[in-house]
Amino acid sequence: MNFFCKEKRQAYVELMRINKPIGTLLLLWPTLWALWIAAQGFPDLGVLIVFSAGVFLMRSAGCVINDFADRNIDGFVERTKHRPLPSGRATSTEAIILFFILAIVSFLLVLTQNSLTIQLSFAGLLLAFAYPFMKRFTQLPQLVLGLAFSWSIPMAFAAQANALPAVVWIIFAVNIIWTIAYDTLYAMVDREDDLKIGVKSTAILFASNDKIIIALLQLTSLILLSLLGWLEDLNWIYFIALLVVGGLFLRQQLQIKNREKTACFKAFLDNNYVGFVIFAGLFLGYL
């Protein structure tokens, strides 16, 4: 079959999740947080463009390698059985080629940045590649995802400021904790299928304590975000934004009250608003 026919192009779009931008947005927001803090509200346009493009490319690469890693189990999960690899619309070889194309283009973008950013990028690529395989070996794959989704933070800060002060690691910690919380919501959707096929997740690990642990993670992220605002001497608008974030977290808790799959997925999607509100608070907080 022609590698570039309409059916194949659609399969590649789905492999890269271009049709589902939520993951790109969840990766973009903390990257923008880091850029705005590193630049005190006025990031370099070139760095902003490079990292915005890099977020799209590396999230796409992560999705492709995730589907490659899960190609033999996705067919047994209701939500994923129609993905390109289990449905036969794309091959494993095509997925690997697509992954390397995306990774290479991402690295070419990184090469336009300073040496510290380039050095950090190697760990980022390793995390992106490793995460999909972790759900077979650890009950905390969401922690590895948190590391992978947070690595753009020190990279973006390094690109803008050519330094990694302590505040970077506060943002880093916030995002890891937030990622574990929202990806546990995502994992709650697949919990029954994952138990059947032996895939591990925090949704399974937390079991009946899932809601309270998610709430504690969300509360911890808010406390650290408040500390960040105090250290950066941000104005009152930022702290109003955090109150809104607290309201969004409360709404998510109400949504997942009965652990209904559709509601859990909706709560996961709502985290896009969390990321946006924090960014808006930072944007206005530096004015």
From Swiss-Prot:
It is a multi-pass membrane protein. Keywords: Cell inner membrane, Cell membrane, Magnesium, Membrane, Transferase, Transmembrane, Transmembrane helix, Ubiquinone biosynthesis. GO terms for cellular component: plasma membrane. Its cofactor is Mg(2+). GO terms for molecular function: 4-hydroxybenzoate polyprenyltransferase activity. Its EC number is 2.5.1.39. It is found in: Cell inner membrane. Catalyzes the prenylation of para-hydroxybenzoate (PHB) with an all-trans polyprenyl group. Mediates the second step in the final reaction sequence of ubiquinone-8 (UQ-8) biosynthesis, which is the condensation of the polyisoprenoid side chain with PHB, generating the first membrane-bound Q intermediate 3-octaprenyl-4-hydroxybenzoate. This is 4-hydroxybenzoate octaprenyltransferase. It comes from Psychromonas ingrahamii (strain DSM 17664 / CCUG 51855 / 37).
